[in-house]
């Protein structure tokens, strides 16, 4: 999710960039979840303050998901704080910490691998996403994705979520639709390729059971002297739990339905964007999602998690 309690960090240039250990981030995130009060760490005070600033314990539809904005060097594997301009050789990434649990979400250990499998599956479905990877340490696997509001180490692009552009109340769950999202794209004069891209994401979310498809999980990017464009997809992961207030059904409706969505419902949306390939896209994504266990095995998702998720996926 992008926005409040999302990915933004202090952009001041006088903040000292320092190397950080991922296990320190995990440790502090765990303590933050168990107690919002002060806690002891093995870091210096200024480093502890900076780590707290880059850690975002955001409450999303699935629960508390600890994230941190970091500067990462792909060649050396070195991690630094991501509050400032990225040093030479570093780029800004968002890391979602694995091995941190809270009572609302339950244990997260293993979900970094699930999100990586979903990333690979989404890419195979033709969905546009930023480069992503797993950072492994101490038997944990943290999902990392490059930030789409940054380019190189310095350039920052303007981003607005669907929610922000339309001045929606994010807390009004089950009040908005994919049709409204497509209409917003028309208002921004986005082209057919963008419409088809969103159609792919919608179909994927239905078949792969990503019910965390709320108004802050779709965004638009405006580059300097450019035009509005659909931002790359993010927060693409399995999010379905029967009985949940948040993810027992889709946040955005499709043809006035949030569950029990049929192929016909998807085709109606396809007709509305004048797509001649909607039936083919649905079949293509259905076949790819049907290979879930291949994607899960590739990144070593545990057998139990892979089976539990596989039982919920749809084929239409």
Identify the residue ranges that each predicted region occupies.
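Phosphate/dinucleotide-binding and metal-coordinating scaffold of catalytic cores
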Residues: 1-215, 219-316
């Amino acid at each position: 999710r992008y926005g409040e309690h999302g990915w933004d960090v202090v952009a001041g240039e006088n903040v000292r960039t320092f190397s950080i250990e991922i296990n320190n981030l995990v440790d502090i995130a765990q303590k933050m979840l168990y107690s919002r009060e002060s806690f002891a760490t093995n870091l210096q005070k200024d480093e502890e303050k900076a780590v707290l600033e880059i850690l975002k314990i955001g409450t999303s539809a699935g629960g508390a998901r600890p994230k941190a904005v970091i500067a990462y060097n792909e060649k050396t594997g070195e991690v630094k704080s991501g509050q400032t301009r990225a040093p030479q050789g570093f780029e800004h990434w968002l890391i979602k910490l694995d091995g941190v649990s809270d009572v609302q979400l339950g244990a997260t250990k293993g979900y970094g691998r699930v999100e990586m499998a979903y990333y690979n599956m989404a890419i195979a479905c033709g969905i546009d996403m930023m480069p992503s990877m797993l950072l492994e340490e101490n038997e944990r696997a943290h999902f990392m994705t490059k930030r789409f509001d940054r380019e190189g180490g310095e350039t920052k692009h303007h981003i607005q979520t669907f929610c922000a552009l339309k001045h929606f109340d994010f807390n009004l769950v089950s009040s908005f639709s994919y049709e409204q999202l497509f209409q917003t794209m028309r208002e921004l004069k986005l082209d057919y390729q963008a419409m088809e891209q969103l159609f792919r994401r919608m179909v994927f979310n239905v078949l792969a059971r990503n019910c965390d498809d709320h108004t802050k999980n779709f965004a638009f990017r405006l580059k300097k002297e450019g035009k509005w464009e659909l931002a790359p997809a993010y927060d693409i992961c399995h999010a379905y739990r029967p009985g949940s207030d948040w993810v027992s059904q889709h946040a955005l409706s499709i043809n006035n339905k949030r569950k029990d969505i049929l192929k016909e419902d998807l085709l109606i949306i396809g007709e509305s964007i004048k797509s001649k390939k909607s039936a083919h896209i649905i079949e293509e994504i259905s076949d790819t999602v049907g290979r879930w266990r291949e994607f899960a095995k590739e990144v070593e998702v545990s057998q139990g998690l892979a089976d539990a998720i596989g039982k919920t996926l749809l084929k239409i």
